Amino acid sequence: MDLYSELTAKYQTVPAIATEIINLEAILNLPKPTEAFMSDIHGEYNAFQHVLRNGSGNVKSKIRSCFRDEMTEATLQRFAFLVYYPSERMAAIHREMAGDDLQQWYLTTFRRLIRLLAFTATKYTRSKVRKAMAPEFVYITEELLYNDADTPDKLAYYWQIIRNLIVLEQADQWIAATCQTIQRLTVDHFHVVGDIYDRGPAPDQVVESLIRRDRRHSVDIQWGNHDILWIGAAAGSALCIANLVRISARYNNLSILEDVYGINLRHLARLAEQYYQDNPAFSPKMERSDRPITEAERLQITQIHQAIAMIQFKLEGPVIKRRPEFDMDHRLVLEKLAPDFSTIKLNGDTYTIENGCFATVDPADPYKLLPEEQEVIDSLVESFTHSEKLHRHMDFLLDHGSMYLRYNRNLLLHGCVPVDEDGNFIGLTIKGTTYTGRQLFDMLEANLRLAYSQPTENADLATDLMWYLWTGPNSPLFGKHDMTTFERYFISDPKAHVEGRNPYYHLRKDPEFIKKILAEFVLDPEVGHVINGHTPVKKGTDPIMANNKMIVIDGGFSKPYQKTTGIGGYTLLDNSYGMQLVTHQPFTTKADAIANLTDIISTRRVVETEARRRTVAETDIGTELQDEVEVLKRRLGELREEE
């Protein structure tokens, strides 16, 4: 149904059409809602949740603006943490207070929350504010929000509502619901610029929290390279599965597979115990002190790590050979090993193999899987493609995600736009057609969605392209020429570890290059920005480049990367006043944050200031609303002519 048919069916009379025109044109003049951008969460749920709850520092800023000099810094901090973590903070209040002190706390807190809610709701319609409220408290909250308690006629009415909430033991529930409403209104829309998944312990909880938040369609995702592994695994790609399991073993994170998604690893564990011994190159990285393991567990993970790595290297061979268009023959590493596995020749240089584990590799046919290995990978494909929870989460990533997004003048993408040294777009030639720039992204996304829709097809081009997205030389999500996984396991010479970043990463400092990219994606080069994730911003490196047109917001949630960055990463806020880059210090733990009121210390840097406040009319939604207004005015004219 086209827009005209849809609107004329919904609004059939002159008064109805006129009312909707008045409503829409009023909305167009409201201030632009606040967007927040974050990326590279890497499964760090608690740090992600803290940023989500505090709105990238925006909640505290709202409190400060609302109450100005009425609160001490300590009082402001306590109130902010109530808004962030209402249930946990109220439990602490109940331990600390009782009787009249608790009653007074309730009365004071109710008044403060109503004031803050009113302050955060000023740039939204009543309808939108209502949708952000908990349904069970809509009536009560609206009565408190839109009534003047200082009017004598309503004063008793106002306070009776509050007293009854306390007497009927609904005060805690109302406070929690109102705090969550304030969180939702403080940031209207969240953009996740890739990599929900990776080495962190709880990517599933990150997805669940996004699903909960999305009841107002307020979340979008631009897939990252690690996300693609999980989407590919759910789609039945054996290579994506092997990579994913290997990374989980490497970072002592197999529990996410077994305990969360119900993936059966028994066949893999038996194979690993049969063929592999201890090996320092495959011992799990113990980057998290909260997940200690026994020596027996460490040995088992080390064996599993080797077994799945060998399966991965074997699976790569047939795909590379049947896809010459991928131009990845240089990654056929197993056939470059000496027959005794003591050395390997790569790019004209011979390297000594250290910590080798090639018991299942036949030098005469190095990519052939043993029957036991084939049984393992078949079992894993079966588990991944039939995990209900995994598919529910991947469905959400597919429904709300894309390879890139054009949103309110800006281009959001996780990795890069592949180019050569001169800045010319490069890509892939498939069946005689060369795809570069925006066409490359569109082609890869179309194939990803095709592969996901047919999980029983696992040797087709669409499925192979999912693996290419993870590791291919011209993959927009990888951004390097080589993924030197094999070399890092078995060769100590750092020369062999070089992966070669795409020239995009040094060219993106040039304003003209960024304008070229914006034009390629049909955005205004003069006012648009590229918002990028994927690469941690090293100490001393500026995340704002190209005369403020390129903004790198790797979230820095992953603790190992914080050694490189020195901070907890960046998020970006874009509101009616302009853009601000928010720098976060590393997050400790949720328990520490709540017990000690330890916020992530954030500093803000203005990226761009609007000459005047931007309105809804200057957003993508505003363009849609203006189209609706034009159609309604046309229909209004038609009805008046018929009178």
UniProtKB/Swiss-Prot annotation:
Keyword Manganese listed: yes
Enzyme class of the recorded protein, top EC level: hydrolase
Keywords: Carbohydrate metabolism, Hydrolase, Manganese
UniProt GO MF annotations: fructose 1,6-bisphosphate 1-phosphatase activity
Pathway: Carbohydrate biosynthesis; gluconeogenesis
Gene of this entry: fbp
Lineage: Bacteria, Bacillati, Bacillota, Bacilli, Lactobacillales
Record-listed E.C. numbers: 3.1.3.11
Catalyzed reactions: beta-D-fructose 1,6-bisphosphate + H2O = beta-D-fructose 6-phosphate + phosphate
Cofactor: Mn(2+)
HAMAP family cross-referenced by the UniProt entry: FBPase_class3 (MF_01854)
Name of the protein described by the UniProt record: Fructose-1,6-bisphosphatase class 3
A matching Pfam family: FBPase_2
GO BP term, example: gluconeogenesis
Superkingdom in the source lineage: Bacteria
Family: Belongs to the FBPase class 3 family.
